């Protein structure tokens, strides 16, 4: 695979996604350092952390569409050039407003996810698309890279200099993409409104968006809330909590290609149903766990299923939407990003209301059960009885 043009572009775009996600997630791990120099309230911090997540999700729709129009090379290149400005602005931030403005445009780093999932399938036969998109999705590990490396580096050279060091990485990848990006990528120029009209009538888009809202939403949400949750509810050391959270992120990320491989070899919808059954069991375990050991089992179960599920879903998207792949990828990935924004808020609200977060995890199980019904409906419409395929 890697001896081909497609293999080279897959490698280039995956590394670009790593860098984009590093920039997208830079504020959160550095916030303990930033708030020592910038006077911010807890409420302002929550807004500052949320802004990149929201914009990084919403921008995925136009980015996916633009990829089909001009090609991944120019969307990646332009995104990296744009990212230089908020990164530099962040390194100079002295007020909450400057942090918010920086975070707003850092969302570009998260939005580039839809570029690769739109471009990469063009280079591979249908039976390899799941694996290819799964490998590309491993670029999500950029979030973990910032989480693991940015704090210790900031402890040595300061958070401002740490942020400015990202300028070198981003500029380097802008240059690499300019030189090695594929100018011959196949373009699909279907008018946006025509695509949206077609997509709005296709129930599969709504199902896939809902499923990804759960799987990728769980991936993002657990990465956000786990460190504080482990410290507050189980009294775990902050460093240990960070390591455990990093394991969750890494496990889900590296299992994403496995989901793609399974989707290539077997019926992806059937495998996804099995995946969600196991995820529901994991959510129930979290909903009844009061001990760290049982909670860890539940978290690892969710991580495994989220990673495999992410890969399976992006095996299905290009299969169902050929001419509208860019917009469909953008919409589905947008919903996944938004899925990571709401769960931490729900967990906090439920904990404040009931004194326990158990009910919030049961909500995840309920959402999973609803997803199973939609999967059964799609499978029966597309393939007939579940006994077939």
From Swiss-Prot:
Q: Does the keyword Cell membrane apply?
A: yes
Q: Which residues cross the membrane?
A: 14-34, 45-65, 69-89, 97-117, 139-159, 161-181, 211-231, 246-266, 268-288, 294-314, 331-351, 353-373
The record's GO molecular-function terms, alphabetically, read:
nitrate transmembrane transporter activity
Its annotated compartments are: Cell membrane
Q: Record's superkingdom? A: Bacteria
Q: Which GO terms describe its cellular component?
A: plasma membrane
Which is a GO BP term held by this UniProt record? nitrate assimilation
Membrane topology designation:
Multi-pass membrane protein
Listed A to Z, the keywords are: Cell membrane, Membrane, Nitrate assimilation, Transmembrane, Transmembrane helix, Transport
Gene induction: Positively regulated by the two-component system NreB/NreC.
Q: What InterPro entries does the record point to?
A: MFS, MFS_dom, MFS_trans_sf, NO3_transporter
Transport in keyword set? yes
Mainly resides where? membrane
Q: Name one Pfam family in it.
A: MFS_1
The entry sums up its family as follows: Belongs to the major facilitator superfamily. Nitrate/nitrite porter (TC 2.A.1.8) family.
Physiological role: Probably required for nitrate uptake under anoxic conditions. Also possibly involved in excretion of nitrite produced by the dissimilatory reduction of nitrate.
Its recorded name reads Probable nitrate transporter NarT
């Amino acid at each position: 695979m890697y001896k081909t043009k497609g293999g080279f572009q897959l490698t280039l775009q995956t590394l670009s996604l790593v860098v984009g996600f590093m920039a997208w997630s830079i504020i959160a791990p550095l916030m303990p350092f930033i708030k020592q120099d910038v006077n911010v309230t807890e409420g302002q911090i929550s807004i500052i952390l949320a802004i990149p997540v929201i914009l990084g999700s919403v921008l995925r729709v136009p980015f996916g569409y633009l990829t089909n129009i001009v090609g991944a090379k120019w969307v990646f290149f332009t995104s990296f050039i744009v990212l230089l400005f908020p990164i530099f602005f962040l390194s100079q931030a002295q007020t909450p407003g400057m942090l918010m403005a920086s975070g707003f445009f850092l969302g570009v780093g998260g939005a580039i996810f839809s570029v690769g999932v739109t471009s990469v399938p063009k280079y591979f036969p249908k039976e390899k698309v799941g694996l290819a998109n799964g490998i590309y999705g491993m670029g999500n590990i950029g979030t973990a890279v910032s989480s693991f490396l940015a704090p210790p580096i900031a402890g040595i050279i300061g958070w401002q200099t740490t942020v400015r060091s990202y300028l070198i990485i981003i500029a380097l990848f802008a240059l690499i993409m300019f030189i090695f990006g594929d100018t011959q990528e196949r373009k699909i120029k279907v008018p946006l409104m025509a695509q949206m009209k077609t997509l709005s009538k296709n129930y599969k888009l709504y199902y896939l968006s809902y499923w990804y809202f759960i799987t990728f939403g769980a991936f993002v949400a657990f990465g956000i809330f786990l460190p504080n949750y482990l410290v507050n509810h189980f009294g775990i050391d902050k460093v240990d909590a960070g390591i455990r959270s990093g394991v969750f992120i890494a496990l889900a990320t590296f299992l994403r290609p496995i989901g793609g491989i399974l989707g290539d070899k077997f019926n992806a919808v059937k495998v996804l149903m099995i995946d969600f059954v196991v995820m529901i069991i994991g959510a129930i375990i979290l909903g009844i766990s009061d001990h760290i050991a049982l909670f860890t089992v539940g978290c690892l179960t969710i991580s495994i299923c989220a990673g495999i599920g992410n890969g399976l879903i992006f095996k299905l998207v290009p299969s169902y939407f050929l001419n509208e792949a860019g917009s469909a990828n953008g919409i589905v990935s947008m919903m996944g990003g938004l899925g990571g924004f709401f769960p931490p808020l729900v967990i906090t609200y439920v904990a404040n209301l009931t004194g326990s977060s158990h009910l919030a995890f049961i909500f995840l199980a309920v959402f999973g059960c609803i997803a199973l019904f939609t999967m059964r409906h799609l499978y029966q419409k597309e393939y007939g009885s579940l006994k077939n395929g």
